[in-house]
Amino acid sequence: GGKSNTVESKVQETAAEETMTVDKDKKEIVMLCEVNGTYFTEPTRHGIVYKGGSNGEKAVLRGLADEKEFYQALLDIGAKAGDNLTAADMKAGPDNGKSVEGDKLDVFVKWDGQDEIPFRDIIKCTEDYTMDLRFGGNIESAKENNTGCVLCLDSCATGIVSDAAWPTGTTQNDIAKFYGDKDVLPEDGTQVTVVFRLAK
């Protein structure tokens, strides 16, 4: 009967809401993620990737919410996308990369027993730097490639959010290597909460 369907769709909606919540007044998005301990020792350019995407197992944090819904959530809190990078930009050499544009975001991580800390604090890098996360946008590329990429650690033409501090070409030219910091993050598989705020 029709009833059971309604119940099921309600259950699914609740599940979706629990993995990502949006507060338009506070201009913030909260996403549940899991630590992937592989990247304590292996470098990756992926900060957060939705577990259902093709790159779902390639990130420091496995995102539990869909990157395309995350894109919409950013629009909903009033963020403007940069949409300035193309696939061609991703083939940059060590000295001609482009930086992602778009509204600046302040991103924090917290978990049981740990208050909010900046996302930068969970990343170990071979170079010292200041993170500059931007709403790159890239929804067309996200739909086409289905990588699941939520947050990239260098400027990216597919990830919804990426870091303007590092131009395209950073990782493939070995300018910087990024890891999850095992001295900061909890153990592999631990659930953490990531908070994205539109910077003032």
Please name every model-derived segment.
Residues 11-200:
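Long, low-hydrophobicity ectodomains and other hydrophilic envelope-associated domains
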